[in-house]
Swiss-Prot record:
GO molecular function: structural constituent of ribosome
Pfam families, per the entry: Ribosomal_S25 (PF03297)
InterPro entries referenced in this protein's UniProt entry, alphabetically: Ribosomal_eS25 (IPR004977)
Name this polypeptide is given: Small ribosomal subunit protein eS25A
Function: Component of the ribosome, a large ribonucleoprotein complex responsible for the synthesis of proteins in the cell. The small ribosomal subunit (SSU) binds messenger RNAs (mRNAs) and translates the encoded message by selecting cognate aminoacyl-transfer RNA (tRNA) molecules. The large subunit (LSU) contains the ribosomal catalytic site termed the peptidyl transferase center (PTC), which catalyzes the formation of peptide bonds, thereby polymerizing the amino acids delivered by tRNAs into a polypeptide chain.
Homology family: Belongs to the eukaryotic ribosomal protein eS25 family.
Highest classification ranks of the organism: Eukaryota, Fungi, Dikarya, Ascomycota, Taphrinomycotina
Gene of this entry: rps2502
Species this chain originates from: Schizosaccharomyces pombe (strain 972 / ATCC 24843) (Fission yeast)
Compartments reported by the entry: Cytoplasm
GO CC annotations on file: cytosol; cytosolic small ribosomal subunit
Keyword Lyase attributed: no
Major localisation: cytoplasm
Note: There are 2 genes for eS25 in S.pombe.
Alphabetical UniProt keywords: Cytoplasm, Ribonucleoprotein, Ribosomal protein
């Protein structure tokens, strides 16, 4: 009989040190980089911009109101946006 396999320790993820308030540099990065993303959602902004979820939702809402990005689909919790095509912008 084979020896009993030991349980792995599992992966330990470090606590995220994401920004919790907007400052000028974050706003500038969002306005410059996010409209170029093909797929835009709260989780994408949290991952790439290193901001927390509430800031990501505020940023997406602001970009959508200004017409920089457009909504593709809305799930019960997750909204998916994309960049505005160049022909309509």
């Amino acid at each position: 009989m084979a020896p009993k396999k030991k349980w792995s320790k599992g992966k330990v993820k470090d606590k995220a040190q994401h920004a919790t308030v907007f400052d000028k540099s974050i706003i500038d990065r969002i306005n410059k980089e996010v409209p170029a993303f093909k797929f835009i959602s709260v989780s994408v902004l949290v991952d790439r911009m290193k901001i927390n979820g509430s800031l990501a939702r505020i940023a997406i809402r602001d970009l959508a109101e200004r017409g920089v990005i457009q909504k593709v689909d809305q799930h019960s919790k997750q909204a998916i946006y994309t960049r505005v095509p160049a022909a309509t912008a």
